[in-house]
Amino acid sequence: MPKTTFEHVDEQADLAVRTYSTWPIWKYTIPYPSTVLMGSSGTPDLGIFLAVGSVWAQVITHFMPNGATILDVGCGCSKTARFLAPDPRIKSYLGLDPMRDCIDWSNRYVSPLTDGRFIFEHVDLHSDEYNPNGMIRAETYRFPVASDSVCIVIGASLFTHLLEPAARQYLNETGRVLKSEGHAVFSLHAQPANGLNFSGDEGRVDIDLDYFLSLADKAGLELQEDLGSMCGQETVVLVKKTGL
């Protein structure tokens, strides 16, 4: 009997099984990931998954130059990438995530449709919440790209899961890899507990926005635009400080 939901079988299932099974995988199209994979990217609901990815892609394309190089930190199972993939202005896209299943799925179903312009890399980051056996510490992690080489850094619901030492490092790395004319688009929960700049755990971190911007300033970044609440998270566009 065909499945009628997004629920799929055990964690050892083949990648093809980890894909929405009641629709065929049409040629030249990106299929939909299973509810398990979507859930690891923030929501198991297909409608919300697609809506959020579409919104983020529209914002990213607003800042996109021809020949764009994009770094998507915490790319999940291509929630945003699936909408960016057809854009011919993108020279290269690198998606990073500690969830290996998401990376494997994306390399199987997204990368081939981009002639290799889009690649996805697993990062074995330690996370008590998401990857407790990971070997790499987020607070010392270095993005695997050259300095001054990236046009756009995407952090969709990234800082919502980073504790302060990791958040500082990721901002520093953004300042390192971003081109002088580049943009970083980040979202965060901005309602920390009273009197705190940071509160919560890796499941949900809240950061005072002014404090976040002060950390960005120390990393050589400054606010270009506050987009306000986007998909339920405060979203900002950062650029390199003039002269850096």
Each predicted region: which residue ranges?
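Conserved S-adenosyl-L-methionine
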Residues: 74
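Class I (Rossmann-like) S-adenosyl-L-methionine-dependent methyltransferase catalytic domain
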Residues: 1-67, 77-142, 164-169, 183-244
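Short catalytic micro-motifs in class I SAM-dependent methyltransferases
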Residues: 157-158
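Conserved acidic residues
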Residues: 68, 151
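A short glycine-rich, Lys/Arg-flanked "PGG" loop and its adjoining helix->strand segment in the class I
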Residues: 168-180
